[in-house]
Amino acid sequence: AQLPPCVISKEAKRTNVTSWMERLWQTYYTGKASGARYVHAVQLEDQYRCHPGLIQFSNRWVYRDGGPIKGLLPLKTPDAVTEQRTYEGRMFDWTMKKDATTDDDILWPMAWLDVAHGTEDSQGHGYDNSSEADVVFDLVLRLIDIGYKATEIAVISPYLRQVNMIRVRLSRPGTKLVTILHDSLEVRVGSVDATQGLEFPCVIMSTVRTVHQALPFVKDLRRTNVSFTRAKAALFFIGHFEAICSRIHKSKDWEIRQASEAWHWLGHHLKTRQQVFGCTPHVIRSLVRSPEGGTQVDCD
């Protein structure tokens, strides 16, 4: 469920060349569907990166054919126990209900900060969104104020132009953030592809786009999965909630349709859990408890 190799050759793209790993898995699933066993596979089920609530999306949309991936809790290693205590009081509640028996009982340490007033900008290749970059700046500053270390925070985006814009915002001379950090590069800012294989206690994802259409990164379930699974303890989405999560795109391509349904599912569950907010103060308060009303609460 990671990102495939980049195909640069035009001829390879034209003939739909795929990697040997993709062909191997395709053979496995073809055999599984037909009852034949062309390839024998073993799926690893234990992971020690993400809080159980953060792995729910991947279990529902990515790993469902092979069985669910187990989350970090119950804690099994001394380091994990120490890490939980470290995050206590400045994270989402890391505990699950003692009588938790279903996925719905597992707390989701994530929130969506709705930047409905933002506007995407495209000049040449790529997109950026200055309103989202400003909100990212504010959120990073507030996270550091409540006790995060800069090295515990990563900001990711599907668009390189947005990555560059956020880097500029975080390193703007004379800002309070740079004064606190001394070195703004301590906060990792990168594309989804660049952060594959990495992990951070807190991840902020800027989605950039504000138009209601079939967006490239929304159509790519594997890239979405990589974005969602970089965080160990807290995941924040910064973006236009309705544009990203409100529609299921009709497509003859099953993978595109499934990816769109996955984002819609995520949005529905975040709204149901009152984890969609309209301003950064509400998001910061949600680190302790989710205020009743979610986006219905008046913003500061």
List each language-model region with its residue ranges.
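Eukaryotic short linear interaction motifs
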Residues: 3-5, 51-52, 64, 119-121, ...
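Conserved beta-strand scaffold positions in the cores of enzyme catalytic domains, especially
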Residues: 41-43, 112, 189
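Short loop/turn segments at strand-loop or loop-helix junctions that form parts
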Residues: 1-2, 110-118, 205-208, 239-240
